[in-house]
UniProtKB/Swiss-Prot annotation:
Source organism per UniProt: Bartonella tribocorum (strain CIP 105476 / IBS 506)
A single BP term in Gene Ontology: aerobic respiration
Protein name, UniProt field: NADH-quinone oxidoreductase subunit I
Domain 4Fe-4S ferredoxin-type: 53-83, 94-123
One of the record's GO cellular component terms: plasma membrane
NCBIfam families, alphabetized: NuoI, PRK05888.1-4, PRK05888.1-5
Annotated membrane topology: Peripheral membrane protein
InterPro entries linked to this entry: 4Fe4S_Fe-S-bd (IPR017896), 4Fe4S_Fe_S_CS (IPR017900), NADH_quinone_OxRdtase_chainI (IPR010226)
HAMAP family found in the cross-reference section: NDH1_NuoI
Named cofactor requirement(s): [4Fe-4S] cluster
Superkingdom field: Bacteria
Cofactor notes: Binds 2 [4Fe-4S] clusters per subunit.
GO molecular function ontology, one term from the record: iron ion binding
């Protein structure tokens, strides 16, 4: 009897017809994708995107040249040169470079920073035409921080209970 049923299924192409109807049902269903350049999807506050150096509200840069981010970076993508000590005993960076080609976006630099100076912001659209444009210097990082400060501060505030 089972041989007869198997022959009937083969003759009527039952698997083919059921697969065809499944494909047609999926073809005419609403698509879950978004039209990317024109529509933006949700980005988590914990998203790790383009790096930025932050400033204090008075305009002074936050980085105290402790070099913890440089020491903890597994890809060795961060290079820092510290300036001389100032009268108040603090130091600031003379040079702060990140090689974004080497960076693996692990977030260790952000976690290690005691003053929340280096952060990974919400920007994920930073494609370049040349490799040299992915070597970020201090000015580029400070410019990113100024551009994304509102979003960065909001994300840090929302993430604070989990740290």
């Amino acid at each position: 009897m089972s041989g007869f049923i198997q022959a009937a299924k083969s003759l009527l192409l039952l698997e083919f017809v059921s697969a065809f109807f499944l494909a047609m049902r999926q073809f005419f269903s609403p698509k879950p994708t978004i039209n990317y350049p024109y529509e933006k999807g949700f980005v988590s506050q914990r998203f790790r995107g383009e790096h930025a150096l932050r400033r204090y509200p008075n305009g002074e840069e936050r980085c105290i040249a402790c070099k913890l981010c440089e020491a903890i970076c597994p890809a060795q993508a961060i290079t820092i040169e510290a300036g001389p000590r100032r009268n108040d005993g603090t130091r600031r960076t003379v040079r702060y470079d990140i090689d974004m080609v080497k960076c693996i976006y692990c977030g260790f630099c952000q976690e290690a920073c005691p003053v929340e100076a280096i952060v990974e912001g919400p920007n994920f659209e930073f494609a370049t035409e040349t490799r040299e444009e992915l070597y970020y210097d201090k000015e580029k990082l400070l410019m990113n921080g100024d551009r994304w400060e509102r979003e960065i501060a909001r994300n840090i505030l929302m993430d604070a209970p989990y740290r």
